[in-house]
Regions:
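Conserved active-site alpha-helix within GNAT-family acetyltransferase domains
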Residues: 108, 112, 120, 132-151, ...
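Conserved beta-strand in the GNAT
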Residues: 60, 69-78
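A short beta-loop-alpha structural element at the N-terminal edge
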Residues: 9-21
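Conserved GNAT-fold acetyl-CoA-binding loop/helix
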Residues: 22-48
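Glycine-rich acyl-CoA binding loop
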Residues: 61, 103-108
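A short helix-loop-beta-strand connector motif used in the catalytic cores of GNAT acetyltransferases and
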Residues: 47-60, 91
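Conserved beta-strand-loop-alpha-helix junction that forms the acyl-donor binding cleft
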Residues: 128-137, 156-160
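Conserved GNAT acetyl-CoA-binding A-motif
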Residues: 119-129
Length: 185
């Protein structure tokens, strides 16, 4: 699916876009003051986004579509599930517009397309995160009618803490404390 006007094309990413996607991810990490945090590779993106069971979806915005297009931004998203609504949800992992294309409606067009996908897929909610200090983004999202869930805390577990908790599963299993069914991923 693509949506275009004379100045902008929004299209679904293709396998040949993994280098561009990774460039956008790295540029976003720099903007978010985490330039060394990206460990993803092109091979990771190719495997996880374009295989038989993709874990993510990605939209690419190209400016000056009539001229072959220049990469302007991207939206990177995946589906989750809300036990409270009993329906799928859409989670926007990344939204990024190159600095030279900001203020031209690229971000709004990408976010509108993601919202349209959520509605098409019968998702009652679209959710994402924004850094507190990113006031241009906070103001932008507020202007579109987004609500901010200040009472919720974002929780993450990585590295040694994740491995330690995973090891607890094996320890409980070997102790006979918990029986488990093998689940295919």
């Amino acid at each position: 699916m693509s949506k275009s006007s004379s100045a902008l094309l929004i299209r679904e990413a293709q396998p040949q876009d993994v280098s561009l996607i990774l460039d956008f991810i790295r540029a976003l990490a720099v903007y978010e003051r985490e330039p060394d945090a990206v460990t993803a590779t092109e091979a990771d993106l190719l495997r996880d986004g374009f295989g038989a069971q993709p874990y993510f979806h990605c939209l690419i915005a190209e400016h000056d579509a009539g001229d072959g297009g220049r990469p302007a931004g991207f939206a990177f998203y995946f589906f989750n599930y809300s036990t409270w609504t009993g329906r799928p949800g859409l989670y926007l992992e990344d939204l990024f517009v190159q600095p030279e294309f900001r203020g031209l409606g690229v971000g709004k067009a990408l976010l509108a397309r993601v919202a349209a996908i959520a509605v098409e897929k019968n998702c009652p909610r679209l959710q994402w995160e924004v850094l507190d200090w990113n006031t241009p983004a906070v103001d932008f999202y507020a202007s579109l009618g987004a609500s901010f869930l200040d009472e919720w805390r974002n929780v993450r577990m990585t590295g040694e803490a994740l491995r330690k908790l995973a090891a607890l599963d094996a320890a409980l299993d070997s102790a006979g404390a918990v029986a488990k069914n093998e689940v295919e991923a």
